[in-house]
From Swiss-Prot:
Homotrimer. Residues 169-179 have a biased composition (Basic and acidic residues). The keyword Phosphoprotein does not apply. It holds the Pfam family DCD. DCTP binds at R110, S111, S112, L113, A114, R115, D128, V136, L137, E138, Y171, K178, Q182. HAMAP family: dCTP_deaminase. NCBIfam families: dCTP_deam. Residues 169-195 are annotated as: Disordered. It catalyses: dCTP + H2O + H(+) = dUTP + NH4(+). Catalyzes the deamination of dCTP to dUTP. This is dCTP deaminase. InterPro entries: dCTP_deaminase, dUTPase-like_sf, dUTPase_trimeric.
Length: 195
């Protein structure tokens, strides 16, 4: 069952779901709560590797990933990060999210941004039960013009569903959880996948 705005407010008030900093109640609408853009970004370096062999030896995949990803880029308040057409970039939400073992979250981009060509979360929009940390956004500009993205702008909306019971292996307790407690635009850790 997806939570309505009344339940989202109650779950936040009772500490069942946590968003830090907590958005004002006027950012809770119908069945979602708005989240804002943080200031941490990472981009792919131009032409630094001919390809990434996703099923190759882990050491080679690690080296390839390291060679293509930039260091963290921190955008000062009031300044903009420019996402050019055909470009993929990683960023984070301003808010850190904490979910219990019986709630799953979903992140959706804003329709107004999609109409400009901005994909906010390319494929991975599920926030697992037991998640704790900022949400990394996978931005892609499929439009024709560069887009200026500024920290603190509303970038998407979270919704929540109560599971039929508590997850047996919530994200926070998994030893193989690659992005546990992430607070910055963490690059892919596909090289840490178990076989």
């Amino acid at each position: 069952m997806r939570l309505c705005d009344t339940d989202i407010e109650r779950y936040l008030d009772d500490g069942i779901i946590s968003l830090t900093p907590r958005p004002n109640n006027d950012k809770i609408n119908g069945a979602t709560i708005d989240v804002r853009l943080g200031n941490s970004f990472r981009v792919f370096r131009e032409h630094s590797a001919p390809f990434i062999d996703l099923s190759g030896p882990k050491e080679e995949v690690s080296a390839q990933l390291e060679s293509v990803m930039s260091d963290e880029i921190l955008i000062p308040e009031g300044e903009a990060f420019f996402l050019h057409p055909g470009t993929l970039a990683l960023a984070t939400t301003l808010e850190s999210v904490k979910l219990p073992a019986n709630i799953i979250g979903w992140l959706d981009g804003r329709s107004s941004l999609a109409r400009l060509g901005l994909m906010v979360h390319v494929t991975a929009h599920r926030i697992d039960p037991g998640w704790e940390g900022k949400i990394v956004l996978e931005f892609y500009n499929s439009g024709k013009l560069p887009l200026a993205l500024r920290p603190n702008m509303v970038i998407g909306a979270l919704s929540f569903e109560v599971l039929s019971g508590e997850a047996k292996r919530p994200y926070s307790s998994r030893k193989d959880a690659k992005y546990k407690n992430q607070q910055s635009a963490v690059a892919s850790r596909i090289d840490e996948d178990k076989e």
